[in-house]
């Protein structure tokens, strides 16, 4: 079997200058083969920039577009192709958008292999360790703060027992942050599990320290990305605060960045995104690294049902895969792109036993939002 094409699909719902905080854009790849098997992958990244990286012409031996690197290759040789893409694009890649694009292709290759062998991806990764995975919901809060009551009330009614919020109006105004936190905690009650995603908005160690102490009475399960992940010393000091769990890692790529982050940040929880960190292949490496270093791994996931399906397959096989993020985005790219999206049911998502990612894309929706 040989790869005949790498098709890049860029989707965007709003106007080109609009924000996509709710997941209103997407980068999808379809890897085509001469045997008719098509693999699907995605990256939660800038779609048009990722497409440019995949389709780039060759400048020299280590400055090559990913499509050129893998055309004509055997898609079942997944690790070989990961290494080949990494090496032959390292002059322009190695981190960031280059690995984001590689992640999408890697997921598509696992989809192909799983379909070819007629077995679920988790079986190719070593076997299924769990039939279902605990899920927490993630939403973007609103302001005025009272508007969050109905949001979280509806999520509790759906069966969520753990929620995370961040983005939107949260992070840039301390008084507003505390007001939003107060309303949400009051609505869910003291025994309900809450996480907060700051997305680096507290900027400095001193400001983050001040805010962490202010939100301590709200009993947060973890504080995610309080500062930029470049500030490893600041992370380490925040992680040393008693009774507070610090998490991060969604913007990091490859085992190399995660090794440094785990070793120097002292973060309690690491959060690689399977569509950014290097795909399923690299996620398995990072997972083993986290286990060796005594870190809890909770994957980041706030994009389409493609990301969700890939993350479920990984967590089904991972030793420590006991928690998954479930987006509450209202974007049609989250709700409708995958026709048979894995559902949330009473606190869990169940692991499908179908070969491949087991998903069906809405091709009419793709054509509607393709750019």
Where are these regions (language model features)?
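C-terminal extensions of enzymes
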Residues: 335-371
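Conserved, mostly hydrophobic/aromatic
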Residues: 3, 36, 105, 118, ...
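Shared catalytic-loop signature of beta/alpha-barrel
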Residues: 213, 219, 230-348
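Metal-dependent enolase-superfamily TIM-barrel catalytic cores that perform enediolate-based chemistry
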Residues: 126, 131-242
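Structured beta-strand/loop patches that form or line metal/cofactor-binding pockets in enzymes
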Residues: 1-40, 44-51, 330-335
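A cross-domain feature marking catalytic cores of carbohydrate-active enzymes
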Residues: 43, 137-139, 165-167, 196-200, ...
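Metal- or metallocofactor-binding catalytic centers and their adjacent structured scaffolds
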Residues: 32-116
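Glycine-rich, aromatic-flanked loop segments that form ligand/cofactor-binding clefts
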Residues: 97, 106-142
């Amino acid at each position: 079997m040989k790869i005949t094409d790498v098709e890049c699909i860029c989707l965007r719902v709003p106007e080109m200058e609009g924000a996509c905080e709710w997941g209103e854009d997407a980068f999808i790849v379809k890897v085509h083969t001469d045997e008719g098997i098509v693999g699907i992958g995605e990256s939660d990244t800038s779609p048009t920039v990722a497409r440019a990286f995949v389709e780039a012409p060759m400048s020299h031996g280590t400055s090559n577009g990913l499509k050129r690197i893998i055309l004509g290759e055997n898609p079942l040789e997944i690790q070989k192709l990961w290494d080949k893409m990494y090496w032959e694009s390292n002059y322009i890649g190695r981190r960031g958008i280059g690995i984001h694009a590689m992640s999408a292709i890697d997921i598509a290759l696992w989809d192909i292999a799983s379909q070819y062998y007629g077995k679920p991806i988790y079986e190719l990764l070593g076997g299924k360790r769990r039939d279902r995975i605990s899920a927490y919901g993630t939403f973007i809060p609103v302001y005025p703060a009272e508007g969050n009551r109905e949001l979280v009330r509806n999520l509790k009614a759906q069966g969520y027992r753990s929620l995370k919020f961040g983005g939107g109006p949260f992070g840039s105004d301390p008084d507003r942050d505390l007001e939003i936190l107060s309303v949400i905690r009051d609505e869910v009650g003291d025994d309900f599990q809450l996480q907060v995603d700051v997305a680096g908005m507290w900027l400095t160690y001193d400001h983050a320290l001040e805010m962490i102490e202010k939100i301590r009475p709200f009993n947060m399960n973890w504080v995610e990305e309080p500062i930029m992940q470049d500030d490893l010393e600041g992370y380490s000091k925040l992680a040393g605060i008693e009774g507070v769990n610090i998490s991060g890692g969604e913007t990091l790529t490859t085992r190399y960045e995660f090794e440094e982050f785990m070793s120097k940040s002292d973060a309690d929880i690491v959060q690689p995104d399977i569509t950014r960190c290097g795909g399923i292949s690299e996620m398995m490496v990072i997972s083993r690294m986290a286990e060796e270093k005594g870190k809890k791994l909770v994957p980041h996931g706030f994009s389409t049902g493609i990301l969700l399906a890939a993350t479920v397959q990984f967590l089904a096989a991972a030793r420590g895969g006991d928690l998954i993020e479930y987006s509450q985005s209202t974007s049609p790219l989250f709700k409708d792109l995958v026709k048979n999206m894995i559902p949330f049911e009473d606190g869990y998502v169940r692991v499908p036993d179908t070969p491949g990612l087991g998903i069906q894309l809405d091709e009419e929706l793709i054509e509607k939002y393709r750019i």
